[in-house]
């Protein structure tokens, strides 16, 4: 009898496992779809069309038919018959229909939709087509938990509406929806007997919420005004309503265990441990408590939060939870790790019995030494197979699914991370993206169920995201030569041999980084606090980059008025000046070390001129303006004090990133206004100090100079309230031509040269007490 039971169990288990593997985890993930009616999704999809091409929207008819294609995958069908006026598009969801509409615009009308600008010139006669496309996987995912702070933090509903439209146009059917959670925590903490002061000292300012949520730090940039909570609740309802109307599944947050310091006072018997010091944040802002997931209080708090969240926003049964982001558990004991993950999951299922836990897989990259195979297997497999969905967060450079054996049976999404900190700088690993998605999808016994975009910041290098979104339907790698030619045509609105040559050079150069260990944190010499010991590696042929610049400028007669052409010309000019700035730095440092005053002074003056030119060209384009970032922040304030607080948050994040420069320049931005009022003053002070050392024959004091830069430039910039333009200043094309005339002949660096520079993620300074006390003022006022 016992043998029969064992055989029966084996048959059931084997059948179940094969069913999961063969049907994309249908049993455990099949319920992850919105419950919105076909009629509502149809109307929402047509709404996207109206907002995008209002004058031509009547030429397109979108409908939803969930039975159009195979279960578990999205399908769209596009039909435009000869002589007919209307293009009919049917999709299995609102997202699928909208995706099909974008596919038609892109590949039949040669149009372009992007974060930068749109090119929507439709042909007089719409092309005929009869095409059916089915997605390659179950999911197309979007967002990184950090994107909410680096890019989305100051968005109003109009900007969110545009982004949700963009998601649908690109087939995104799974996305984070993190707005408003602090308002929920406010309610929960009050029910748990915390005072308002307890809560205020824990919740960070808006620009730093992502890292407060993950337990990396607390309180900095706060306190959060009540108006922020009210606004974010309203905004989250708008976001969720629209996502669900279109068929996009929102991923809500779950309790990860990070709690305010007040928990120690209120719950002295609970198992609480201080989180580790993250990036040298001092005690005032570091180290919240971690409530051990195995403690009964964890389930209580987690259930309270999730119940309150669902009562407010509803649910689609998938929750993100990252307990150990850039932190490690207190022990590597396998039993403990299994208990921890099981307890985290149980806190979800106590409220939602069909909950799926989404885990960002960054911990397996960032703390690889801790997360060995045994530790990872123990942590992952204590959750039922298929009830955890893992984001393989940086698959294009650091895929973990091979090392961790397809996450020991848990499904995962192949993600392109691509960007850290929302920094600017031309970069891509285009060959990796074009090949490795299919390696993951075709892996024997693999558990890949989707593709994803997981940048820390957006509004940069759109070409990489345009390609990556296509991996959701492609069944084999793209012909990149052809693809880049078509990209230039779509983006600028016409065929031009010079634009095509420019993009082919960029494809094979700056967008084809083949070094998996390349540090792509956007750490460029001119953007960082000056020192004598900096190095930077240029992985591409800078001669070819300069040739691309020549070619793109030669396309100006045809595309002078094209918004995306102007953007790209500014961006490429910015990259050229960035590279040249690194060259000048290397030359002047060598001259300083050799005591050659003449060469030093010549190159120091050239660097000052270069930075002025950089600010000039950046200020000519809407997408590179500090003023837009600051005004968006202030617009959310309901009082002068709130506007002041939000502006401080906005300025600090892109410069000091912390009260004392804990993550200095990690999220630096090459924007007009930042260069002139932050980068250039730092370089002026540094170059003046070096010059004095040479002329007067006294030793250069790097520590003293860094302290001066901190106190005289960096801190004042974060506290300043000067206004900056929100509209472009000057003609981008004409300014780029002038910059080209000045600098083109001086571009001579050979490919692969190392420029002295090496960056540490943490570079905080020691300053006197009372020197940096803005937060006490804000706290008193709120």
Range-by-range predicted roles:
Residues 671, 675-759:
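Extended, compositionally biased alpha-helical segments that mediate assembly or anchoring
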């Amino acid at each position: 009898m016992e043998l029969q039971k064992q055989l029966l169990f084996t048959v059931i288990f084997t059948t179940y496992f094969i069913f999961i593997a063969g049907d994309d985890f249908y049993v455990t993930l099949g319920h992850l779809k919105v419950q919105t009616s076909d009629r509502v999704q149809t109307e929402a999809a047509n709404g996207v069309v109206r907002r995008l091409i209002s004058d031509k929207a009547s030429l397109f008819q979108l409908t939803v038919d969930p039975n159009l294609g195979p279960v578990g995958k999205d399908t769209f069908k596009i039909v435009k018959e000869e002589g007919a006026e209307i293009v009919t598009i049917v999709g299995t969801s609102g997202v699928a229909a909208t995706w099909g509409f974008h596919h038609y615009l892109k590949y039949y009308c040669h149009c372009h939709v992007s974060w930068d600008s749109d090119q929507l010139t439709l042909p007089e006669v719409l092309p005929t087509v009869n095409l059916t496309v089915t997605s390659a996987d179950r999911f197309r995912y979007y967002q990184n938990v950090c994107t909410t702070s680096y890019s989305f933090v100051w968005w109003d509903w109009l900007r969110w509406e545009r982004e949700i439209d963009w998601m649908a146009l690109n087939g995104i059917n799974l996305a984070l929806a993190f707005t408003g959670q602090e308002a929920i925590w406010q309610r929960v903490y009050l029910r748990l007997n915390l005072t308002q002061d307890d809560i205020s000292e824990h919740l960070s300012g808006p620009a730093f919420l992502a890292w407060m949520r993950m337990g990396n730090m607390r309180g900095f940039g706060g306190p959060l005004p009540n108006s922020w909570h009210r606004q974010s609740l309203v905004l989250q309802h708008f976001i969720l309503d629209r996502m669900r109307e279109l068929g996009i599944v929102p991923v809500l947050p779950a309790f990860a265990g990070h709690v305010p310091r007040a928990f120690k006072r209120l719950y002295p018997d609970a198992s609480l441990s201080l989180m580790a010091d993250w990036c040298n944040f001092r005690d005032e802002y570091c180290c919240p408590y971690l409530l051990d997931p195995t403690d009964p209080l964890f389930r209580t708090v987690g259930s309270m939060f999730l119940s309150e969240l669902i009562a407010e926003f509803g649910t689609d049964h998938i929750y993100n939870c990252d307990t150990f982001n850039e932190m490690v558990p207190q022990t590597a004991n396998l039993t403990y790790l299994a208990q921890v993950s099981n307890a985290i999951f149980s806190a979800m299922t106590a409220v939602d019995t069909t909950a799926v836990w989404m885990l960002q897989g960054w911990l397996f990259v960032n703390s690889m030494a801790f997360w060995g195979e045994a530790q990872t297997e123990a942590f992952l497999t204590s959750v039922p197979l298929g009830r955890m969905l893992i984001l393989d967060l940086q698959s294009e450079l650091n895929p973990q699914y091979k090392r961790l054996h397809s996450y020991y049976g848990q499904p995962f999404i192949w993600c392109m991370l691509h960007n850290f900190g929302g920094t600017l700088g031309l970069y891509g690993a285009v060959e990796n993206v074009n090949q490795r998605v299919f390696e993951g999808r075709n892996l024997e016994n693999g558990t890949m169920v989707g593709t994803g975009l997981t940048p820390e910041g957006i509004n940069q290098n759109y070409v990489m995201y345009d390609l990556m979104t296509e991996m959701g339907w492609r069944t084999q790698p793209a012909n990149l030569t052809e693809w880049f030619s078509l990209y230039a045509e779509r983006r600028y609105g016409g065929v031009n041999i010079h634009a095509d040559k420019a993009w082919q050079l960029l494809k094979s150069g700056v967008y084809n980084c083949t070094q998996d260990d390349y540090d792509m944190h956007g750490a460029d010499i001119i953007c960082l606090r000056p020192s004598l010991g900096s190095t930077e590696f240029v992985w591409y042929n800078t001669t070819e980059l300069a040739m691309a610049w020549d070619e793109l400028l030669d396309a100006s007669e045809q595309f002078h008025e094209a918004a995306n052409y102007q953007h790209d010309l500014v961006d490429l000019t910015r990259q050229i000046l960035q590279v040249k700035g690194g060259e000048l730095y290397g030359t002047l440092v060598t001259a300083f070390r050799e005591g050659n005053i003449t060469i030093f002074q010549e190159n120091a003056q050239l660097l000052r001129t270069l930075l002025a030119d950089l600010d000039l060209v950046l200020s000519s384009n809407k997408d590179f303006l500090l003023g837009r970032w600051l005004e968006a922040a202030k617009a959310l304030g309901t009082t002068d004090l709130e506007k002041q607080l939000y502006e401080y948050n906005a300025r600090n994040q892109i410069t000091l990133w912390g009260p004392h420069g804990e993550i200095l320049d990690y999220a630096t931005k090459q924007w007009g206004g930042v260069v002139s009022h932050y980068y250039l003053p730092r370089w002026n002070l540094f170059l003046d100090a070096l010059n004095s050392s040479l002329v007067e024959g006294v030793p250069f004091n790097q520590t003293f100079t860094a302290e001066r830069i901190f106190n005289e430039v960096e801190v004042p910039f974060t506290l300043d309230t000067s206004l900056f333009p929100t509209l472009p200043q000057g003609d981008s094309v004409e300014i780029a031509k002038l910059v080209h005339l000045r600098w083109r002949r001086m571009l001579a660096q050979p490919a692969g040269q190392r420029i002295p520079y090496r960056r540490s993620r943490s570079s905080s300074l020691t300053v006197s007490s009372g020197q940096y006390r803005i937060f006490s003022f804000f706290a008193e006022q709120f």
